[in-house]
Every structure is written in structure tokens, then in C-alpha cells.
Regions:
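Active-site cofactor/cluster-binding pocket
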Residues: 2-9, 13-218
Length: 218
């Protein structure tokens, strides 16, 4: 996601003044977004947080491993509903979003075979350590199968290549994969709310909305 911002999208941290709504004891939605530095992991997470607040839901977020340097591991936890901590507990993720395939594997501990849906981008960014160690990057099907043993479903999306086809840049891969998630109704936030936040951040006629809508059509 890129463009000129009107209102800063930022990490929610512990919580900003949440407007809580009535929720059932187990009414919560847990998302973990991962990738490497420069892919827009934090931006996507903060977009979800703003959308959750817009719908007057209790939202808590956390960024793990600090502000990653470019190509370093990045992880963002987004929790919504009846939650009191910022970190998603083990075996509690409803949704995993991996903007880099290999980065999805360390998140297996958060997955539940009965409910977790994982989305992974097909484009690989090989870690420098693999060249140093002389190891090979696993095939995308191998990564999918390894993750599938922990999840209810794993969906591979050509997010980077499709974003580049639409805009000329893979920068918008995070928005493209979000569009697919919305299309499949795998997230507890309304499409109209996401679009409203994007309009507030980048204006009504911005490329992020174009990418989102293209992903939802295809």
C-alpha cells in the first residue's frame, strides 16, 4: 500500500481509547500478518486496526520483533472483540496473512486445525542466511503442505505479481491479498469500512482502492 496519507496510519500499540461493544465470551477475531521489512506488514495491520475502530469494536494490536530492517522478519498481531492482551495466544489465530511464503512457517504454533485460514503470497524473497548456509528455498507447494498440517485451509495468492500487473509495482501486494480475503469473507470487517479508511488515508481516487476492487473481482 502506498500513496500520500491524509491521516497517519500507525501501530495501535497497547490500545487507543477503544469504543467497546457487547461481545460474547468467546467473540473474538485474531489475525497475524507476517512478511519481511518493506512489504507493508505494519501498514496492513494498522489499516485493519483503524477499520476495527471505525466499526466501534474493541481492538488490540502488537508489533513483534521491532521495526524490522528491510528484508528482516516482521510480524503484526491484530485482535478484535473480547480480548484483553495484544498477542494472539497459541492455537488461536483465525487468519494468517503471509506476504512472504517462508515467513508463514514460524506461525504454525498460532494455528488451529479446526479454524485457521492462511493466505500466502506466492512470490519468494530468499533470506540471505540461506545463501550463507548453502540451503535451498523450499518449493511453494512444500510450504503450503507444511502449513496445511496445522491449518484448516491454506490459500496461495499471486498477490505481488497481480499487484504489479495492475499498478506496475508489487508494493500493493498487501492490499491485493486483503481484497482476496474480503472476497472470500474470511475477515470480520466490512468491505465498505476498509474502503472508507482507504479513502480517508489516500483520497477517494487512489490506487489502493483500485487494487482492492480488482482483487475482489478476480
Amino acid at each position: 500500500m502506498a500513496g500520500k496519507k491524509n491521516k497517519k496510519i500507525e501501530n495501535e500499540g497497547e490500545n487507543k481509547e477503544n469504543k467497546k461493544v457487547n461481545v460474547k465470551e468467546n467473540d473474538q477475531f485474531n489475525v497475524i500478518i507476517t512478511g519481511v521489512g518493506g512489504q507493508g506488514v505494519m501498514t496492513l495491520g494498522s489499516l485493519l486496526a483503524l477499520a476495527g475502530h471505525e466499526e466501534e469494536k474493541n481492538v488490540m494490536t502488537s508489533e513483534l520483533h521491532g521495526l524490522a530492517k528491510r528484508f528482516g522478519h516482521t510480524e503484526f498481531h491484530f485482535r478484535m472483540g473480547n480480548v484483553t492482551t495484544t498477542i494472539v495466544p497459541n492455537k488461536s489465530a483465525d487468519l494468517i496473512i503471509a506476504l512472504e511464503p517462508l515467513e508463514s512457517l514460524p506461525l504454525a504454533k498460532y494455528c488451529d486445525k479446526e479454524k485457521t485460514i492462511a493466505y500466502i503470497d506466492s512470490v519468494q524473497i530468499k533470506p540471505t542466511r540461506m545463501d550463507i548456509e548453502g540451503t535451498n528455498y523450499p518449493d511453494i507447494e512444500e510450504i503450503k503442505n507444511r502449513l496445511k498440517s496445522h491449518c484448516k485451509e491454506v490459500i496461495v495468492v499471486n498477490a505481488s505479481s497481480e499487484a504489479k500487473r495492475i499498478t506496475g509495482s508489487s508494493t500493493y501486494s498487501n492490499i491485493y491479498i486483503l481484497g482476496k480475503i474480503i472476497k472470500n469473507k474470511h475477515i470480520g470487517i466490512k468491505q465498505s469500512t476498509i474502503i472508507k479508511i482507504l479513502e480517508e488515508q489516500f483520497g477517494k481516487d487512489n490506487i489502493n482502492i483500485t487494487v482492492l476492487k480488482e482483487a475482489m473481482k478476480e
